Amino acid sequence: QLTRKKLKPIVGIGVGTPGLVNTREGVVVNAVNLEWQNLPLSQLLEKKYKLPVLVLNDSQAAAIGEFVYGGDHLPDENLIVVNVIHGIGAGILINGQLFQGDGGGAGEIGHVVVLENGELCRCGKRGCLETVASVRAVVKQMKMDSLDNVISVFQNGDSKAKSVVDRAGRYLGTSLANLVGT
């Protein structure tokens, strides 16, 4: 639709996707929540839209978006943006530059083990942060069908909801403290 409107020339497409991304190749190496492995997303979209495509981890893209458009950030600022949805990820900027780490996985905190012998995660490990603190995990622990329902009972003072949310918050908070402290 945007290409037909031609308000300004479109020079490329940027895509944020969950999971481990090889940004140079435009390949989603592993996105367990989408069941994607070695998906050449950039190539597929370039073929369809005839435009260059940059594929980036969604949390990393969010961090860049916050840095550029979110406020009065200093050029050499350090910043962490955390996404908590089906999975948990962080986008990290150090001195105003995106930090991806070797292999692009910096910030993939959802698969850090926080609970020894915990629930089996979709990644194959046990006790990952995502198994206790993601939206999916909280909804599952509450035996409900949506986050809206969890929020509703939480706001109405449900003790189980308070316990589940408090536990998720403790694990997430500890993980973020460890991330900031590294």
Question: Where do the PLM segments sit?
Answer:
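Phosphate-binding/catalytic loop of phosphoryl-transfer enzymes
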Residues: P9-G124, C128
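ATP-binding/phosphotransfer module of carbohydrate and carboxylate kinases, centering on a glycine-rich
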Residues: Q1-V11, R24-E25, K47-L51, G70-P75, ...
